Amino acid sequence: TNYNVTINPLPTPVISGLNAVCANQAGVIYTTPNVGGHTYVWAITGGAITGGAGTNSITVTWGTAGAGTLQLTETITATTCAVTTAFYNVTKNPNPTPVISGPATVCASDAGDVYSTVNVVGNSYSWTVGGGTITAGAGTNSITVTWGSGASGTVQLTETVTATGCATATANYNVTINPLPTPVISGLNAVCANQAGVIYTT
């Protein structure tokens, strides 16, 4: 007689999500279709699962630049039939590392002060200045600033790798704006020809 064997179907997990991210990028979501009665076990290298472990949708924070992987084992609870996906490879692109150079102490109303970072071909530059005005170089790696009359100012730079969208914003580069002296000349404004000993002061 025939010995009947039931051949249960296998699940078909498919991972969806970004396969290129920025180093240390958080909040990246990976999913597979949710099927009732199935369980989901995720494995990760080069990052950490920060939400959704044990479900069909996880949230990941990736680590430093390099390669990362995800793998998913989906199991049909009723039959214990399971499939583990191939590795889902993720490239973690490096972030730029802008460093601002320029005078940290200036005089009120100074003009022509230059602030810069190393120029990297293919990167873009967005500057923000507090307490002064950018007069040249906006959108480049080197700007010229005219300072105002306040006691302090700040320079901040966001550098972006155009090809990947990976960006880094610097902390504020603090600038001390020293006040100008206020000389006032006192003395006669009308004198006699050849008059000697006339005193002027401030």
Question: What kind of feature is each model-predicted range?
Answer:
Residues 9-18, 94-103, 179-187:
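Proline-enriched interdomain boundary motifs that mark the N-terminal boundary
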Residues 35-41, 120-126:
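Solvent-exposed loop segments of extracellular immunoglobulin-like
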Residues 72-74, 157-159:
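Hydrophobic/tyrosine-rich beta-strand signature of extracellular beta-sandwich/beta-rich modules
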